């Protein structure tokens, strides 16, 4: 699917919902987008916010032969280029920013989604067999199964046999859920309903792994299950969300090749509203073809 097709899908879905098509965010406003650089500078400041756009655009090469080339290179990528060296070692600011980004990534793995936040979104909360974050990181197999209490809650509080069941889970990035939720779930649910699909009760799974959607689909009798889950964070990118969609999942028979994945959903990647429109189109095609993953025809 090329960019033109994606834009057409977004226009179609947003128009059917009676909403304006969102305009692309300017690159300078996107996290992870190409930074806007001033003239190269070698000044290092302890007061600089290491997570700021200014820090990301910092050029630490001393006495450059072609400063304009460095500026253009720094603009062209979010990678760690033009940071300079102090002999064989990285410069202080470059090292501190590296450590800060690494810490941010670790923090989002270890943080918990606040229960108050889940309640504020009006979501039913259930858990996998995991009881705490440490167990979640060391026993991924338990994160693929719902707890007995969760199974009872789904059977008693959720719509049975929906066309599409939407599930939200923290996964390996708390920030991915809290940062993107309001921009992806409301338009996603509205788009699915506007398409005439029977949408199940959306809910939140704490400590969930991707394969848990198979058990959810089997219990609720859903034709398509859409799981929005936090991705494993990269260095300095802790807000990336993934969508795993599967048709008629079964615990015993569904394999990873049966899933269709849309990854890198965040303001510096695929914008959440755009992703919602693409997911709506994907769900419709899954229902038409009665397939997902590698079994779908393009």
Swiss-Prot record:
Molecular functions per Gene Ontology: cobalamin binding; ethanolamine ammonia-lyase activity
UniProtKB keywords: Bacterial microcompartment, Cobalamin, Cobalt, Lyase
Cofactor needs: adenosylcob(III)alamin
UniProt catalytic activity: ethanolamine = acetaldehyde + NH4(+)
Cited InterPro entries: EutC, EutC_C
GO biological processes: amino acid metabolic process; ethanolamine catabolic process
Cofactor binding, note field: Binds between the large and small subunits.
EC number: 4.3.1.7
Top-level lineage group: Bacteria
Cellular compartments annotated: Bacterial microcompartment
Main location: other
Any one Gene Ontology cellular component term annotated for this protein: ethanolamine degradation polyhedral organelle
Pfam families with a match to the protein in the record: EutC (PF05985)
Pathway recorded for this protein: Amine and polyamine degradation; ethanolamine degradation
Binding site for adenosylcob(III)alamin: 210, 231, 261
Assembly and interaction partners: The basic unit is a heterodimer which dimerizes to form tetramers. The heterotetramers trimerize; 6 large subunits form a core ring with 6 small subunits projecting outwards.
Free-text function comment from the UniProt entry: Catalyzes the deamination of various vicinal amino-alcohols to oxo compounds. Allows this organism to utilize ethanolamine as the sole source of nitrogen and carbon in the presence of external vitamin B12.
Family assignment from sequence similarity: Belongs to the EutC family.
Name of the protein this chain belongs to: Ethanolamine ammonia-lyase small subunit
Lineage: Bacteria, Pseudomonadati, Pseudomonadota, Gammaproteobacteria, Enterobacterales
């Amino acid at each position: 699917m090329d960019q033109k097709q994606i834009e057409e899908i977004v226009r179609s879905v947003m128009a059917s919902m009676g909403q304006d098509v969102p305009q692309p965010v300017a690159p300078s406003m996107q996290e992870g987008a190409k930074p806007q650089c001033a003239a190269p500078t070698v000044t290092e400041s302890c007061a600089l916010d290491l997570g700021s756009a200014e820090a990301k655009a910092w050029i630490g090469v001393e006495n450059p032969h072609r400063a304009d080339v460095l500026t253009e290179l720094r603009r062209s990528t979010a990678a760690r280029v033009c940071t300079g060296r102090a002999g064989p070692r990285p410069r202080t600011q470059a090292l501190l920013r590296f450590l800060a980004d690494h810490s941010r990534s670790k923090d989002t793995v270890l943080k918990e989604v606040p229960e108050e936040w889940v309640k504020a979104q009006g979501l039913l909360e259930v858990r996998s067999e995991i009881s705490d974050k440490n167990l979640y990181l060391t026993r991924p197999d338990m994160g693929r199964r719902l707890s007995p209490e969760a199974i009872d809650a789904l059977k008693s509080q959720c719509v049975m046999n929906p066309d599409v069941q939407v599930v939200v889970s923290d996964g390996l990035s708390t920030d991915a859920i809290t940062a993107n939720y309001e921009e992806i779930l409301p338009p996603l649910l509205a788009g699915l309903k506007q398409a005439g699909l029977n949408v199940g009760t959306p809910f939140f799974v704490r400590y969930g792994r991707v394969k848990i959607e198979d058990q959810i689909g089997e219990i609720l009798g859903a034709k398509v299950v859409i799981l929005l889950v936090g991705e494993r964070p990269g260095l300095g990118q802790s807000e990336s969300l993934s969508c795993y969609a599967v048709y008629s999942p079964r615990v015993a028979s569904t394999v990873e090749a049966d899933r269709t994945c849309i990854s890198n959903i965040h303001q510096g990647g695929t914008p959440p509203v755009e992703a919602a429109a693409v997911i709506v189109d994907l769900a419709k095609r899954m229902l038409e073809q009665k397939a997902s993953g590698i079994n779908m025809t393009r």
